[in-house]
Each structure stands twice: as C-alpha cells, then as structure tokens.
C-alpha cells in the first residue's frame, strides 16, 4: 500500500527535492506551497500523512495540523527550521505526532513512514 502524503513546504527547492525522494520510495505525494492550498487539498482528498513546515507564508503548520485532524484521521509530521527544544513541545501538543528539525533526517522519516505502512497493513 502506498501512503498518500500531503507535503506542505513554501521553499520551492526543498518541496521539489523531498517530494522526489518520497516518490522514489513509492509514496504518493501531493505537494502544496502554502496553507491555503493545503487546506483545499484536505477538503478534496484523503491523506494518510501530513508532512508540514511550521512557518508558511499565509498561515502556520500549528493551525494547519489542527484543521487537518478535524477533517480526517492522519499522522502529522512537523518539518521546521525552529530548532530549539522549546519549539518541539508546542508542536506536539497541538497535534503533530512527530517533529523534525531541518535539515531533514530522511532515514528517520522513512522509518516513521514504514511504521505507518505496517499499522495500515494490519
């Protein structure tokens, strides 16, 4: 089963690179550059995973995860440049299940995604 991932990242190069890597490992990736686009996609499609930057040009990932989880059950992963320990706690308390500080540790992300696939397969 291929996970459908909504990847929200405003930085074009990062969005393209991470999307390509995820597709290489056979994940179904839909990429959005901002909050508004991501919210519209959440209304249109069902996702297994939300992978979102925290700082977006028209909103923030903290609010997006709250909206996303009110619309559908999914695993939410924060990807952010906010790298202090004090930033992780609010991210997890607002609904993110995992918190990554940039640069992305792709091996750790793949391990988490494999775990999600395993749970979906049971």
Whereabouts are the PLM-identified features?
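C-terminal output helix
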Residues: 104-114
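Conserved acidic carboxylate
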Residues: 9
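Short amphipathic alpha-helix used as the core "switch/output" element in two-component signaling
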Residues: 62-73
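Acidic, metal-coordinating helix/loop segments flanking the phosphotransfer/catalytic sites
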Residues: 31-49, 89
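Alpha4 helix (beta4-alpha4-beta5 surface) of REC/receiver domains from two-component response regulators
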Residues: 63, 83-99, 111
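Acidic catalytic/metal-coordinating carboxylates
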Residues: 34, 60-63
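Two-component/phosphorelay signaling modules centered on CheY-like receiver
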Residues: 12-30
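Active-site residues of response regulator receiver
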Residues: 53, 80
């Amino acid at each position: 089963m291929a996970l459908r991932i909504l990847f929200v990242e405003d930085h074009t190069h990062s969005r393209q690179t991470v999307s390509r890597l995820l597709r290489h490992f056979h994940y179904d990736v839909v990429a959005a550059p901002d909050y508004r686009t991501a919210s519209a996609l959440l209304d249109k499609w069902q996702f297994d995973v939300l992978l979102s930057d925290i700082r977006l040009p028209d909103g923030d990932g903290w609010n997006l995860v709250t909206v996303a989880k009110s619309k559908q059950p999914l695993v939410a992963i924060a990807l952010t440049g906010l790298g202090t320990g004090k930033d992780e706690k609010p991210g997890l308390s607002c609904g993110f299940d995992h918190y990554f500080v940039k640069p992305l540790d792709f091996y750790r992300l793949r391990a988490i995604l494999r775990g999600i696939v395993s749970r979906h397969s049971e």
